[in-house]
From Swiss-Prot:
CDD domains from the UniProt entry: Ribosomal_L10
Family from the record: Belongs to the universal ribosomal protein uL10 family.
Quaternary structure annotation from Swiss-Prot or TrEMBL: Part of the ribosomal stalk of the 50S ribosomal subunit. The N-terminus interacts with L11 and the large rRNA to form the base of the stalk. The C-terminus forms an elongated spine to which L12 dimers bind in a sequential fashion forming a multimeric L10(L12)X complex.
Keywords: Ribonucleoprotein, Ribosomal protein, RNA-binding, rRNA-binding
Protein name: Large ribosomal subunit protein uL10
NCBIfam families the record matches: PRK00099.1-1 (NF000955)
CC per GO annotation: ribonucleoprotein complex; ribosome
InterPro entries: Ribosomal_uL10, Ribosomal_uL10-like_sf, Ribosomal_uL10_bac, Ribosomal_uL10_bac_type
Function noted in UniProt: Forms part of the ribosomal stalk, playing a central role in the interaction of the ribosome with GTP-bound translation factors.
Amino acid sequence: MANPRNEAALAELKARFAETDTVVLTEYRGLTVAQTTELRKALGFDVQYSVAKNTLVKIAANEAGIEGLDDLLTGPTAVAFIKGEAVDTAKVLKKFGEENKAFVVKGGYMDGNALTAEQVNAIAELDNRETTLAKLAGAMKGSLAKAAGLFNAPASQVARLAVALQDKKDA
């Protein structure tokens, strides 16, 4: 690999793998430049979507300690390097794939595990972090209100009992 362009591309891929939390591999065969540009815009700033040679991706991934991608690196491959919320990116990729039949999610890598295409699509079905935290906070708030009601119930029962006893003595 004496080609300086390959060496520069490999160095860039290594840096991206080092900075990335999650990686999704896709097949872009049949997409126009306009469609690819549209996808990059939809992915946003937390995702770098790049076309790279499979051999360079294999080398960079292996040197970064990422295993399990070799079987996915066949045919034309583009890599989505995700720095932020993987769920949001998976949703964008899934929606784009539904709108553009030529686009295929091959699989990926997240939290030390290789992912199949089905697993990436399953991630797209999850709620993102903010929504999950909001649901959790709502559930906790409801539970706290119930607990407060339970703690106040004996005190109000004692007060009603005292009033009933007083009424009985007065009668």
